[in-house]
Amino acid sequence: MPVLGSQRRLLGSLNCTPPATFPLMLAPNRTGPQCLEVSIPNGLFLSLGLVSLVENVLVVAAIAKNSNLHSPMYYFICCLAVSDLLVSVSNVLETAVMLLLEAGALAARAAVVQQLDNVIDVLICGSMVSSLCFLGAIAVDRYISIFYALRYHSVVTLPRAWRIIAAIWVASILTSLLFITYYNHTVVLLCLVGFFIAMLALMAVLYVHMLARACQHARGIARLQKRQRPIHRGFGLKGAATLTILLGVFFLCWGPFFLHLSLIVLCPQHPTCGCIFKNFNLFLALIICNAIVDPLIYAFRSQELRKTLQEVLQCSW
């Protein structure tokens, strides 16, 4: 990526320098104190990408195989898996080409590598935007299923779900093209940061409201069964833990990347911000980790999907 990820650009591999020996080191900063820089080896990028690739392919295969999973909720989960799949594919492809260029096993002109780099950047940006959108869509779908349970199937219909999915993909592609074209414009970066904050706020409000409703429902059941404290306390702790994991993973994996974008606008020349910029590869690795964790949170918790996944694995063997 031109501004965001110069450390990961393919063009840099045409005239590369030897990688650092130690994964964690203090990087000198001539205008300020020393910086703590975490170096992510290309092999680790490749390994994380492959794990995410396999995991999300299994989710897509399981949902496609089982007709019982052909519902709006699982279609949103499937599209989230496809988005995470594209994040993994783009990073695996970029890392593989970089390793081949560094080893001298692939001879390519700078113009060809530039075009490939642009294609990969569009894939990465588009898949990131679509991934955030489908996380928000899943949150809205669950909210409607809880607060409007009787009207859910009339509100969230398959045609509407398909239109939402198509709109998200089109918007993601257009956004990625605009981002790559106008990456050096402050407005573009601010729009991306604002989009992340909006998704974070949307998910936090919806899931907190859902947790409050679930706890209220549990209290009502507890009063009927005259066992208010044990049920309410256990359910509340479990719900709070689930909410903390869901929002915590989202914030920890995506937050540093969008902090990086914010600092490019706010303090591009400040020494402290420069220290954060040096860890861009770590922020990309966290996004790939999110692509690994998403199936565990949204897909594999479904008993029906796990059962189908076992059938898919047995057929593959």
UniProtKB/Swiss-Prot annotation:
**Which controlled-vocabulary keywords does the entry list?**
Cell membrane, G-protein coupled receptor, Glycoprotein, Lipoprotein, Membrane, Palmitate, Receptor, Transducer, Transmembrane, Transmembrane helix
Query: Topology relative to the membrane, per the entry?
Result: Multi-pass membrane protein
Q: Which InterPro entries match?
A: GPCR_Rhodpsn, GPCR_Rhodpsn_7TM, Melcrt_ACTH_rcpt, MSH_rcpt
Q: Which residues are glycosylated?
A: 29
In this entry, the parts of the chain located on the Extracellular side of the membrane are 1-37, 94-118, 184-191, 267-279
**In terms of one coarse class, where is the protein primarily found?**
membrane
Q: Which Pfam families match?
A: 7tm_1
| Highest taxon of the lineage | Eukaryota
Bilayer-crossing residues are 38-63, 73-93, 119-140, 164-183, 192-211, 241-266, 280-300
Recorded hits in CDD domains, A to Z, give:
7tmA_MC1R (cd15351)
Query: Where's it found, cell-wise?
Result: Cell membrane
GO terms (molecular function) for this protein are: melanocyte-stimulating hormone receptor activity
> What SUPFAM superfamilies would the database entry show?
Family A G protein-coupled receptor-like
GO terms under cellular component: plasma membrane
Q: Where is the signal peptide?
A: none
- Family membership noted in the UniProt record: Belongs to the G-protein coupled receptor 1 family.
Task: State the oligomer form and interacting partners.
Answer: Interacts with MGRN1, but does not undergo MGRN1-mediated ubiquitination; this interaction competes with GNAS-binding and thus inhibits agonist-induced cAMP production. Interacts with OPN3; the interaction results in a decrease in MC1R-mediated cAMP signaling and ultimately a decrease in melanin production in melanocytes.
Q: What is this protein called?
A: Melanocyte-stimulating hormone receptor
Q: Which organism is it from?
A: Rangifer tarandus
